[in-house]
């Protein structure tokens, strides 16, 4: 199931490809894992809502901070260990070998002719929307707390950025592969944008 990269302390598997998924496997819009989809959004959205309304709901900063940290911790565990595997077939984790060396493993479910399971497009959209949108919100909250001198909230906001950013980074690595693939993908994208811009300028002139 896993192919190891000898030049990196990570392990990757064959990754989902959009074209192969479209041609080889039927896509359905219905939600196949409603409970997982619910909890994928519940903890992270609840943490954001509590952060925004905590000063209105409670005068105790400690109570609000503990509630937000608990919600963020539950979200990190649920997204890392449950919802990613069920909703999009991705998983990342760490293990230490016999020599005490740490290895990061990034897994993606392989598409095989024997696999009759369908991919839920609705679940995929829910997963990636929640995975990307919430860390962006926490980054905005971090700048807001910094510039408004709400120093006491910085620790809470930074924890939100770190925990949800870690899941985002891990699943992006699962999706695009190793660092080399991620770098080449970014380079290829920038090259295409540069070429397209130059082509457009040439046609205009």
Curated annotation (Swiss-Prot):
Bilayer disposition of the protein: Multi-pass membrane protein
Disulfide bonds: none
Primary subcellular site in the record, as a coarse category: membrane
Residue intervals passing through the bilayer: 34-53, 54-72, 126-146, 152-172
Pfam families xrefs: DUF846
UniProt keywords, alphabetically: Acetylation, Membrane, Transmembrane, Transmembrane helix
Taxonomic superkingdom: Eukaryota
Residue numbers of N-acetylmethionine PTMs: 1
Localization, UniProt: Membrane
Protein name as annotated: Golgi apparatus membrane protein TVP23 homolog B
């Amino acid at each position: 199931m896993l192919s190891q990269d000898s030049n990196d302390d990570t392990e990757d598997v064959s990754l989902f490809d959009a074209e192969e998924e479209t041609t080889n496997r039927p896509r359905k819009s219905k939600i196949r894992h409603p409970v997982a989809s619910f909890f994928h959004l519940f903890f992270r959205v609840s943490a954001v809502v509590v952060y925004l309304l905590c000063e209105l709901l409670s005068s105790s900063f400690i109570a609000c901070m503990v509630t937000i940290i608990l919600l963020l911790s539950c979200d990190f565990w649920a997204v890392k260990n449950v919802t990613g595997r069920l909703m999009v077939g991705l998983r990342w984790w760490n293990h230490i070998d016999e020599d005490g060396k740490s290895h990061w493993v990034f897994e993606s479910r392989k598409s095989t002719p024997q696999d009759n399971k369908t991919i839920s497009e609705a679940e995929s959209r829910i997963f990636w929307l929640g995975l990307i949108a919430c860390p962006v919100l926490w980054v905005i909250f971090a700048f807001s707390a910094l510039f408004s001198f709400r120093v006491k909230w910085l620790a809470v906001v930074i924890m939100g950025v770190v925990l949800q950013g870690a899941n985002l980074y891990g699943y992006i690595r699962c999706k695009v592969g190793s660092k080399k693939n991620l770098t080449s993908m970014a380079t290829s994208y920038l090259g295409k944008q540069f070429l397209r811009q130059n082509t457009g300028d040439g046609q205009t002139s």
